[in-house]
UniProtKB/Swiss-Prot annotation:
Disulfide pattern: none
GO BP annotations listed: photosynthetic electron transport chain
Similarity section: Belongs to the PsbQ family.
Signal peptide coordinates: none
UniProt-recorded name of the protein: Oxygen-evolving enhancer protein 3, chloroplastic
Gene Ontology molecular function terms on file: calcium ion binding; electron transporter, transferring electrons within the cyclic electron transport pathway of photosynthesis activity
Keywords: Chloroplast, Membrane, Photosynthesis, Photosystem II, Plastid, Thylakoid, Transit peptide
Membrane-spanning ranges: none
Keyword Repeat applies: no
Amino acid sequence: MAQAMASMTGLSQGVQLPAGPRRAGGRSRLAVVRADAAAADVQTGRRAVLGLVATGIAGGALAQAALAEAAKPIKLGPPPPPSGGLPGTLNSDQARDTDLPLRERFYLQPLPPAEAAARAKESAQDIINLKPLIEKKQWPFVRDDLRLRASYLRYDLKTVINSKPKDEKKGLKDLTGKLFATIDGLDHAAKIKSPEEAEKYYTLTKSALGDVLAKLG
């Protein structure tokens, strides 16, 4: 009986003895994990610092390059000649009567009769030159160019007619009225995109322009 109790006591002691080393091993592993995590945090922090330093260096280099580029002198050419020195500036140098009420302002520069007649001939030639655009059915360009040139032509013909003697004014006014009737027909043909109507009114407009220009001399 005593031996059995001693055996049980020894067995009980044998089971309890390994508990101490196991706890010590667990604590050591936890310490190793914590040490590894701390080392990883340190490494991550170093990488972040190095990244910020590299970004700062690159930004400084770019800023210096931009400043160096901005410091280069800019070469400026001479101003364009008046009245259409560059594409799209044909109307840029024309006088505006900004001191007058809006309804009385002119958006075209008034010219003497002789110069107005010369500009009217140029506008007429520009209208005649719309033929390729009509053939290509480029209707927006046809309408825009036609309206621009017709506005010049109308204004200059009015200047020329007002300078003529009374007996010549009526004939020019009649021819001008017929001319702008055909121009309106050509504008409408471009609006409805009708090649047949555009060809018809282009021919009539070209003929009417010839009649008017013949009177201008």
